[in-house]
Amino acid sequence: MTNSWHESVSPLFTVLEYLGTFAGAISGVRLACQKRFDWFGAYVIGFVTALGGGTLRDVMLRVHPFWMEEGSYVLTTFLAVVAVWLFGRKFISGQITWFVFDTIAISVFMIIGLEKTIVVLESQARAAGLVQTNCAWWVAVTMGVITAVFGGVLRDICINEIPLIFRKELYAMACSAGGLLWYALYWCGVEDAYVRYIASVLFIFAIRALAIKYHLGVPVLSGRGQHIHMHKKQRKVT
């Protein structure tokens, strides 16, 4: 089933998939270096960041994880370690560098996960002889988000940080918006897959950039009692 996916995509999608893998691995290796991990530890962090989301997606779709059939993805994650070693200061220092690589990764992985889910589930439905073979839009968007963010969740857990997806930043919501744009273009009659893909990726990137620049985010959930307790404590101090 995984082979049918690779056969159905164009060379451009394949190139973007490798770009996303490399960018995701860079974002993971960069954080591992800041935590003073050794080479092996840095590689593991880069590996789970770049391939963790796609692995969970494929397991949920009941197909072989993509990197087990295409060893070049594993090599790509190793090249990210080498790149950080060669150009360490440029890749390790600065939040902008991390933002660019991380956002490229989640943008590309979101749409790849969405499209692969559609291809695989509809292929499985046809093979089973089902009358209804269309993949539900919310399933595809959800699987795209899992593909995009789950590797980062594993990365943050491994480096003992609160996963970024659970903090204030627009992360999973930006991916969801990109997936909805993909479907909106499809429903509006945009047949060109390249247009849908590129527009959705750029849309996710733009949302993340605006969120960082203007400090946009999801409100933090806290109980009413906590606010009251903090307010009383402040009054006692004053």
Q: What positions do the PLM features span?
A:
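Ordered, amphipathic secondary-structure segments that act as subunit-interaction surfaces
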Residues: 79-119
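Short, highly charged, low-complexity non-transmembrane loops/tails of multi-pass membrane proteins
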Residues: 219-238
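Cytoplasmic-side transmembrane-helix entry/capping segments in multi-pass membrane proteins
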Residues: 40-48, 69-75, 95-106, 139, ...
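Alpha-helical transmembrane segments in multi-pass membrane proteins
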Residues: 24, 45-53, 72, 76-80, ...
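C-terminal ends of transmembrane helices
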Residues: 25-35, 58-59, 82-95, 153-164, ...
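Structural signature of hydrophobic alpha-helical transmembrane segments
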Residues: 8-21, 66-79, 132-148
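Short, strongly hydrophobic alpha-helical membrane anchors
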Residues: 1-12, 125-131
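Hydrophobic alpha-helical transmembrane segments in multi-pass integral membrane proteins
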Residues: 112-122, 177-193
